[in-house]
Amino acid sequence: MKIGLCAYSGYKIYPGHGKTMVKVDGKTFTFLNSKCEAAHLMRRNPRKVTWTVLYRRKFKKGQEEEQTKKRTRRTQKYQRAIVGASLSDIMAKRNMKPEVRKAQRDQAIKAAKEQKKSTKAAKKASAPAPKAKAAPKAKAAKVSQKSAPRVGGKR
């Protein structure tokens, strides 16, 4: 037993009931009754007609009572150690006074600069004296072959 659906109202159409309309372009519409067919032919929007399934769906009619809203899980802050730094180290750095932190940073920068300076000096000392540049070679002039004379009259 095949149960169809009305093209206008959305209600079920049981065998032996309903009417099928075939348009010139080959589109088929099955209607439950003449009321649906007439409304379709008058080009009434089924979403605006109160007794259709589309209207009831649009305005959320006849649905079971809404379930309680899903509770969203809130993210919780969690502190843990990172590779190369234990939790106690991280907490100690965080609780440091800004002046102390600034002094530490300046000291670290100074040490890095000194290191860079010393490596540069060592590199300079070990590098040999630059050689005098050799005289550039003279380029040979290109020999171009003369093309054959054009033959064939006017173009």
UniProtKB/Swiss-Prot annotation:
Q: Which SUPFAM superfamilies match?
A: Glucocorticoid receptor-like (DNA-binding domain)
Pfam families under this entry?
Ribosomal_L24e (PF01246)
List every stretch annotated Disordered.
92-155
Gene encoding the protein: RpL24
Q: Which SMART domains does the entry mention?
A: TRASH (SM00746)
Which processes are annotated in GO (biological process)?
cytoplasmic translation
What family name appears in the similarity comment? Answer: Belongs to the eukaryotic ribosomal protein eL24 family.
List, in alphabetical order, the Gene Ontology terms for molecular function in this entry.
mRNA binding; structural constituent of ribosome
Does the UniProt entry include the keyword Iron? no
Q: What domain of life?
A: Eukaryota
Organism, as annotated: Spodoptera frugiperda (Fall armyworm)
| Listed name of the protein | Large ribosomal subunit protein eL24
Q: Its GO CC terms?
A: cytosolic large ribosomal subunit
